[in-house]
């Protein structure tokens, strides 16, 4: 068994709908990013890649890879799942913690967990918190996400 940690942060834009944890959130602005800006998915991918010893999200989905421009989080997870399965690695579970004032994750937590779990083929749990007004997340400028993954190597 191996564990991996992934982190990501994105600032809010002034246009578009927020995409986070595999869902669209109309109560928050879009997150800037090369793909759809889904910081939860990026942290998830980073954690799984780290646990598997396969690099990081920048190596697999980086801004130097035009095929990932505008990609959805589910598309990224699908590619990650194929990569992991091709190495005979089993993903036991992923835990995600979203830090920010918006969107309000608790309203759709179960839905987000299902979307990400279905895409990954392994259990994904999501927690959320705020920083009580401190830092860029507390000022409502963006979100920060931490993820942990547990995998079984062949």
Predicted ranges, named:
Residues 1-115:
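RNase III-family endoribonuclease catalytic core
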Residues 118-122:
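Beta-rich strand-turn-strand
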Residues 126-130:
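Pyridoxal 5′-phosphate
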Residues 137-154:
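C-terminal edge-of-domain segments
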């Amino acid at each position: 068994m191996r564990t991996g940690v992934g982190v990501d942060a994105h600032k809010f834009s002034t246009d578009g709908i927020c995409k986070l944890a595999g869902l669209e959130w109309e109560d928050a602005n879009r997150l800037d990013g090369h793909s759809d800006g889904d910081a939860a998915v990026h942290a998830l991918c980073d954690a799984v890649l780290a646990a598997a010893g396969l690099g990081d999200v920048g190596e697999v989905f980086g801004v130097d890879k035009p095929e990932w421009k505008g990609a959805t989080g589910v598309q990224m997870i699908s590619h990650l799942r194929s990569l992991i399965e091709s190495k005979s690695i089993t993903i036991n579970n992923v835990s995600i913690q979203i830090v920010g004032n918006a969107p309000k994750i608790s309203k759709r937590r179960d839905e987000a967990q299902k979307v990400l779990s279905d895409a990954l083929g392994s259990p994904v749990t999501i927690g959320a918190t705020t920083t009580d007004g401190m830092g860029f997340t507390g000022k409502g400028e963006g979100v920060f996400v931490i993820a942990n993954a547990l995998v079984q190597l062949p």
